[in-house]
Every structure is written in C-alpha cells, then in structure tokens.
C-alpha cells in the first residue's frame, strides 16, 4: 500500500452537509483538497476536525456541492492509477488515464474549485486535483483535471495550454503523466546517480547525494554528494573529494564559487539556469535538482561560476530577480550538515 493510501487509513470518514453563508465563497474548505465531482452524493470529508453547518441548503457552487475530499497533500502519479483498497472513499482508479489532463505552472493561490470552474467551459469536469506538498501544505504548482470524454480532453488541451490564469500561462498536456525517470535515478543498493561506479544518486545504500555513507553525486567514482561521511565529494568529485565531507578537502567543481538558487519555477531546467547566469560570468556548471521518485523539479538548483567576483556579481544582480514568473533567491551555497544534525 502506498504512503498516500496509508495516510488515509488514519482518518475516519464522516458524512456532513457542506454549507456556507455566502454562496460565492469557497473559504469554508481547507486549501489542500482533492475534488471528485458527482451529482447525487453527500459530502464525505476526511479530516481530523469536523465542520459545523447549520443548514445544508446553500452551497458555494456546483463544483463543491458534492465533493469527495481527501486528506492527501501530495499525490504521486503512480498512486493515482494504482489499485486502491476497496474501502477507500476516493476511487482514483475510476476514470481512464486517457481522460486526465496535467495542468502545470499554476499560481500557488489556485485551488481545485477554481480549476474546476475554469475547465467547465471545455466540457463536463469529472475530477480536479491540485497537488500540495505534504510537509509545508503549500501548492506544488500543478494538478490534474479529468474530463468525461476524449473529445473534451482534446478541446481542453487546445483551449487552455498557454492560457493565462491568475497571472501565469498554464501548461496543459493530455493523457497520463510521463513515467518516472527510473533510468536516470538508480535505486539499487550499490547503484546511484549519473554513471557512478559505487556511488551515485540520492541517498542510495552505498552511494548517493546528500549525506550518504559512501559518497555519490554526479558521475563520481566513489565521491559526490553533500557531506558524505567517508568518501564525500561535490558534483563529479574524485574518490575522496568532498563538499563539506568528513574526509578529503574538495575537488570536482568545488564549493567556493557555487551559488544556491531557490524558488525556481517548475519549468526551469539546467539550460534555462545556465542562460540566466551566463550574463554574470563563466558558468562552470548549472544544475536543477529533481525529485528522485517523480522526476519533477524540487524548485531549487546550484550554479558554479569561475570566480568569486562573478559570484558576488550574480548575487547582487539576480537575487530577487523574476524568472518565469517567480522571484528567485540567490545566495552562496553552503555545505549541508552531517546527517546526525538534521
């Protein structure tokens, strides 16, 4: 059973009428919701606190009057299509994947009700899900809309791809989401990131990224990662190079001229990051960090320049600058603390 499904089992369903005093408002709902639209069912709310309503007669709109509300914050694509428990209140497997649209570059203020209202003009909306981070509770800037027919899916994709909504152009793709990038992120006990011999990706058993036991990182032999205990190393580090490591003294691309770049739009990739910083100096490396399971951007990255003067110039010029609709944060990168300090 997936982590999302397990988290649902901790909640006891309660059937309650949903009502608000002002029909135009949907503020009665929590921000982290998955909406499933029906015609003749009560509202099932799964949450740790109950809503109190004096009358079931008034509803904010037809998009929220009969809604199955899930306590999930973050829903991975595999969970959306996996066979769920028979007792699960929200059946994510009830619609064909071909009827689902991916909607990206959402404003963080957009919730499922607003998205449903938008897509109504393209046809009959069956389900809307805006995905939220399960740690912060903040929207991750994307969601899914399920239509009732393939023709409506095509019409919605044509109508809304590139459509500006709440100040941001939407990215709308028809069909199921792309497969996870398992070919890029090996997860075996002796595997790792990009072409490493015994190290590699993100936290593998004997290699990998951040604070691993025996190193990892990008293309290293046994190095890489941030603050590894025995074989550390920066991106593409040598056998005993380190970036905040317990052993070794740094090589690879080094940390002295490395910048942290945060609050990136989900659509920004390595090339976009490199092009932005090319104006500030010679870019040695530009890399956006991706989630190991979903393959999606984690919203931050690192840029290495050739000199400390270029680093300061980049900070002064680009910290707070607008990139793809978001104000980026630029600062000098620091070594992450050892695992015991988290």
UniProtKB/Swiss-Prot annotation:
It comes from the Eukaryota. InterPro entries: Euk_RNA-bind_prot, Nucleotide-bd_a/b_plait_sf, RBD_domain_sf, RRM2_NsCP33-like, RRM_dom. Disruption phenotype: No visible phenotype under normal growth conditions, but mutant plants exhibit increased sensitivity to cold stress. Residues 190-237, 245-255 have a biased composition (Gly residues). GO terms for biological process: cold acclimation; mRNA processing; RNA stabilization. It is found in: Plastid, Chloroplast. Residues 167-255 are annotated as: Disordered. Residues 1-65 form a transit peptide. GO terms for cellular component: chloroplast; ribonucleoprotein complex. Residues 99-177, 257-335 form the RRM domain. Residues 178-256 are annotated as: Linker (Gly-rich). Keywords: Chloroplast, mRNA processing, Phosphoprotein, Plastid, Repeat, Ribonucleoprotein, RNA-binding, Transit peptide. The modification Phosphoserine is found at residues 107, 204. One of its GO terms (molecular function) is RNA binding. Stabilizes specific chloroplast mRNAs. Required for normal chloroplast development under cold stress conditions by stabilizing transcripts of numerous mRNAs under these conditions. This is 29 kDa ribonucleoprotein, chloroplastic. It comes from Arabidopsis thaliana (Mouse-ear cress). The lineage of its organism: Eukaryota, Viridiplantae, Streptophyta, Embryophyta, Tracheophyta.
């Amino acid at each position: 059973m997936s982590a999302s499904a397990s988290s649902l089992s901790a909640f006891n369903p309660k059937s309650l009428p949903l009502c608000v005093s002002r029909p135009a408002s949907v503020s009665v709902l929590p921000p982290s919701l998955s909406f499933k639209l029906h015609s003749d069912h009560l509202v099932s709310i799964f949450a740790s606190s109950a809503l109190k309503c004096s009358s079931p007669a008034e509803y904010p709109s037809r998009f929220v009057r009969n809604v199955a509300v899930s306590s999930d914050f973050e829903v991975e694509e595999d969970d959306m299509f996996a066979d769920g428990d028979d007792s699960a209140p929200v059946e994510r497997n009830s619609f064909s994947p071909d009827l689902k649209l991916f909607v990206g570059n959402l404003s963080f203020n957009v919730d499922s009700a607003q998205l449903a209202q938008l897509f109504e003009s393209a046809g009959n909306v069956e389900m809307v899900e805006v995905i939220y981070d399960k740690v912060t509770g903040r929207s991750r800037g994307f969601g899914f809309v399920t239509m009732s027919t393939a023709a409506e899916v095509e019409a919605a994709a044509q109508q809304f791809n590139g459509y500006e909504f709440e100040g941001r152009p939407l990215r709308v793709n028809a069909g199921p989401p792309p497969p996870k990038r398992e070919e890029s992120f090996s997860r075996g006990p002796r595997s790792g990131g990009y072409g490493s011999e015994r190290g590699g990706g993100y936290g593998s058993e004997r290699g990998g990224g951040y604070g691993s036991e025996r190193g990892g990182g990008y293309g290293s032999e046994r190095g890489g990662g941030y603050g590894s205990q025995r074989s550390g190393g920066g991106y593409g580090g040598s056998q005993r190079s380190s970036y905040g490591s317990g052993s070794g003294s740094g090589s690879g691309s080094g940390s002295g001229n490395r910048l942290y770049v945060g609050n990136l739009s989900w659509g920004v990739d390595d090339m976009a990051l490199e092009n932005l910083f090319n104006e500030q100096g010679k870019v040695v490396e530009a890399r956006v960090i991706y989630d190991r399971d979903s393959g999606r951007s984690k919203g931050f990255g690192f840029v290495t320049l050739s000199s400390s003067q270029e680093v300061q110039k980049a900070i002064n010029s680009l910290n707070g600058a607008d990139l793809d609709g978001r104000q980026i944060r630029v600062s000098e990168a620091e070594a992450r603390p050892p695992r015991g300090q988290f």
